[in-house]
């Protein structure tokens, strides 16, 4: 079967069934057309995303940062305000807003030096750790993400993984060197120092430094060879949060396709169809899965015994009381394949 004919039919291949507490709700499947049950799930997921609570869900970092900023502005004591400022900066860092987080840590440092020197000394180590981490993340975002190579962020850093945009790692080293002089045995700071140094192309074998991790640390008695990263060259480089993966033949053409989910409330799955020529084509929209967001894990099986691979999607892991999110059963209805 050619890819174009599947392209026309794949929009009808998956329908969504609600699953709760381990029990299958058959009525939506039995009495609703695929489009109706899928739309019902889309609306349910949207409502849950809008109702998510940043107080209880510690992974809603952007919302939590804004929440702490509002609380800091309303704080009635200096200590409380400064505590909330630190929490806001940490949340911006976890949200991926590295430079905004840096601004927050720098603002806290300036205030603490001026009005609370004892508090500054008490939090000095933590502050320097986070400030250097902000710079490390800037370097990763500008190089590993925006200017990705097949060697990006693979340890130990090889020549192709050295950062072309150097300000992130250089900024980190400007903080880490004086911090390590004060905390010379701290392993976390040493680790960040080595990452920043390697991404700048510094060689531990030729540069004498007491904080280097020996190159022998990365050696192994077992040579398993090299697995080159070819995702970008075959159309399979998906940039998303952690999620599930199923590799199987979804359209019955004898070729292995790729289906991945992403954990975030608003993150769509990605369906990549094997074209038989060594590449994959994104067919997510045609598959009808685009708005069925979220999902940390997936399980594949032919639950209805029609010869097609179906997919069970699990949501809500690690979210505690916020994790009561309906699961999905995506029925592959590729009849005639």
Question: Can you say where each PLM-predicted feature lies in the sequence?
Answer:
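Beta-propeller blade termini
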Residues: 243-252, 273, 286, 295-305
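Helix-turn-helix repeat elements of alpha-solenoid scaffolds
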Residues: 52-69, 96-111, 165-174, 221
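Hydrophobic beta-strand segments that make up the repeating blades of beta-propeller
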Residues: 245, 255-262, 311-315
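Blade-edge motifs of beta-propeller repeat domains
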Residues: 205-240, 272-293, 328-337
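Short coil/linker segments at helix-helix boundaries
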Residues: 107-125, 133-178, 201-223
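Amphipathic alpha-helical repeat scaffolds of TPR domains
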Residues: 35-52, 78-90, 121-158, 187-194
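Short, solvent-exposed loop/turn segments at conserved positions within beta-propeller repeat blades
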Residues: 263-267, 320-325
